[in-house]
């Protein structure tokens, strides 16, 4: 029946799938895809990865999904200001290679600078000494030949996303018992119960994204369940990154004054430290928050979270609006984070490298598995259980 619906009546996810089908139809010689995984569910992304990795013609794709790029790409085109460079290999190979090259150049420059300083000190010290004139002349020639390569400025800047818990968690983190929620007549989840243990980093999944957002709102204390209870441990200090942050920016405060609302220390010097880590430097901190881009707002929200020194993070789709460098920095820190994390994401790599436990919400119950994301999506027993829970009549 969906095949005969008007495009205008379709939701965003359905429209994306129609446009994707239109692009793929006829197997064109050159396929240009701009963020093709946006608004696609996990199963569709996996299908697209498989389809494109076996595609016989040319594919040019822009994406922030690192796993997707690794799965389909044979070459990476790196555009950095006016420089365009072509690399053989997938995204991970390019990332590791570029990081290694940057470190090697920095080390070479450091050694060259040290040698330059040593030669200049010798020349200054013995320039008036006739007995050392030969050695001085020799070192002058060495100094002229010494090449300290100028490191070109890069548009790639990695924010300092560092969450540091003020205190270690106790043994009791979070207990959720019998939570149910129906919105506008649609049951999002029913009698959901789970206990978060010390060290758990839990990725929440659902075919209905509103279910996860609603659950997080309830856990964070911003919404009420139809039934059930949420109980936090006494040692837990949580920080919440909501999916929709628009209400935080409905004002004309400057970035620094906006952040001051959430800080005990409101001095500009202190706040600059946090904003600098989030790549807001100089006079940028006086920019009005109501004109910020989606990525800038997200960096403000992350700075706000860092101020809390929380030992439990609740993150609803945290990579939204972030560039690749910010996603990588976020990902790297969460892997090292010593507290607990409850999060949702559409980023395969992000989930697989952070989560050690998966909880999937369905209208007819939940699935709770202590395993990685890769293991979860390929587990036959999980697939059977998902089919049963999603297809059970209410």
PLM regions and their residue ranges:
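Short hinge/gating elements
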Residues: 124-126, 159-163, 257-259
């Amino acid at each position: 029946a969906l095949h005969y619906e008007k495009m205008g009546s379709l939701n965003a996810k359905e429209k994306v799938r129609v446009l994707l089908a239109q692009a793929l139809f006829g197997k064109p010689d050159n396929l240009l895809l701009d963020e093709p995984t946006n608004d696609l569910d996990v199963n569709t992304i996996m299908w697209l990865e498989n389809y494109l990795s076996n595609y016989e013609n040319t594919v040019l794709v822009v994406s922030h999904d690192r796993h997707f790029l690794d799965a389909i790409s044979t070459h990476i085109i790196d555009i950095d200001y006016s420089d365009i460079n072509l690399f053989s290999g997938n995204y991970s190979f390019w990332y590791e290679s570029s990081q290694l090259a940057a470190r090697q150049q920095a080390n070479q420059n450091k050694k060259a600078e040290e040698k330059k300083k040593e030669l200049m000190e010798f020349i200054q010290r013995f320039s008036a000494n006739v007995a050392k004139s030969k050695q001085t002349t020799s070192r002058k020639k060495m100094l002229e030949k010494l090449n300290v390569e100028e490191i070109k400025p890069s548009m790639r800047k990695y924010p300092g996303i560092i969450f540091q818990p003020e205190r270690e968690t106790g043994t009791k983190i979070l207990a959720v018992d019998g939570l149910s929620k129906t919105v506008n007549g649609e049951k999002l989840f029913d009698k959901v119960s789970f206990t978060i243990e010390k060290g758990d980093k839990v990725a929440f999944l659902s075919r209905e994204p509103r279910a996860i957002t609603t659950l997080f709102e309830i856990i964070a204390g911003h919404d009420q369940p139809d039934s059930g209870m949420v109980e936090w441990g006494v040692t837990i200090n949580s920080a919440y990154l909501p999916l929709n942050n628009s209400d935080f920016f409905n004002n004309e405060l400057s970035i620094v004054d906006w952040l001051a609302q959430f800080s005990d220390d409101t001095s500009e010097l202190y706040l600059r430290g946090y904003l600098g880590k989030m790549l807001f430097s100089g006079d940028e901190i006086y920019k009005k928050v109501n004109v910020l881009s989606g990525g800038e707002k997200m960096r403000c929200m992350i700075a706000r979270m860092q101020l809390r020194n929380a030992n439990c993070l609740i993150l609803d789709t945290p990579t939204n609006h972030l560039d690749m460098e910010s996603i990588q920095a976020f990902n790297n820190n969460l892997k090292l984070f010593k507290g607990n994390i409850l999060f949702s994401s559409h980023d395969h790599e992000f989930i697989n490298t952070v989560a050690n436990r998966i909880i999937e919400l369905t209208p007819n119950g939940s699935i709770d598995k202590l395993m990685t994301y890769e293991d979860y999506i390929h587990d036959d027993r999980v697939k059977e259980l998902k089919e049963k829970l999603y297809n059970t009549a209410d």
